[in-house]
């Protein structure tokens, strides 16, 4: 179990590792259901440069700040940047899931 936690921390620094651990249990505290649904309903597309900058700033906030501050940062993102962040988050969750040991 400790080894899995180390891998998760390496994948996601700071507070993000704790948020991903919650996500692996099905709880996604950064996003409301509508944002998650919108991200999966829209066609996948490359992230625009301005969205990448906004997502990068949001990720720094998520890694460093308490959850309420991180949620406010996510909520303040333009729609396309929020959509990109949700998709990135779920890609990180997929990666974290792959790193988990198999359970029988």
Model-flagged regions — what are they?
Residues 1-104:
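Short amphipathic alpha-helical interaction elements located at domain edges
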